[in-house]
Regions:
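Conserved mixed alpha/beta catalytic, RNA-binding, or beta-rich assembly cores of soluble enzyme
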Residues: 5-207
């Protein structure tokens, strides 16, 4: 079977991080943007985050815990139990997270995703604030312009945020769902299903 990447390559469905930045700025205003529930992935999400941060003045990065949607763990439930933390209700600041859990490098890759994602945002020229929470509404205490990066729960997350008073909510499927400055796009999925191609280029899901 043809892999997605081969099909995408034959279609030339590529976009630049600058295309992402321009789309994010146009749709979310370029100020403080909440980026919530991303997966922890160097290949899939890191390059999207770079583009998003280039289109923002500040990024409030809200990570789900103890793991992301596809099971990449930041923490174990044992660690949460030991610290007396309830992931359903408790919101952790970066300071609190570090105080309780330290560095927490990823079990297989050795990457501290909290630090890694923070550095991507800073290097893209934006300020960063990191929080840990599992209720979508929490982000509304920080900003009303939000990109919800979850995949299977994205419609529900968007609904909760809009009902809670968010001004603008974009899913990953709403970014690059039309061409920006001649770059690639996917009308149905936008950035969903995309992969890093180079440091400054992303390979989108074939149309």
């Amino acid at each position: 079977a043809l892999t997605e990447s081969i099909v995408a390559r034959s279609q030339g469905n590529y976009a630049s991080v600058q295309n992402i930045a321009d789309d994010v700025k146009a749709k979310l205003g370029g100020g403080t943007i909440g980026v919530i529930f991303p997966i922890l992935s160097r290949n899939r999400f890191a390059i999207c985050l770079k583009g998003i941060a280039m289109g923002a003045k500040k990024v409030v990065l809200m990570l789900s815990y103890p793991s992301d949607e596809v099971g990449n763990a930041l923490l174990t439930y044992d660690q949460l139990d030991e610290a007396g933390i309830n992931p359903y209700t408790d919101v952790l600041t970066l300071e609190k997270y570090r105080e309780l859990f330290g560095e927490n490098k990823h079990e297989f890759t050795g990457v501290d995703y909290v630090e890694y994602y923070s550095n991507i945002i800073k290097e893209a020229g934006a300020e960063v604030e990191v929080i840990f929470a599992n209720q979508p509404k929490t982000i509304l205490d920080y900003t009303d312009c939000i990109i919800n990066c979850d995949i299977h729960t994205r419609a529900r997350t968007k609904r909760i945020l809009l009902a809670g008073g968010a001004k603008v909510v974009c899913g990953m499927d709403d970014i690059l769902n039309a061409s920006v400055n001649g770059g690639g796009c996917n009308e149905k999925y936008g950035l969903l299903g995309s992969n890093k191609s180079t440091e400054d280029q992303i390979k989108l899901f074939p149309n």
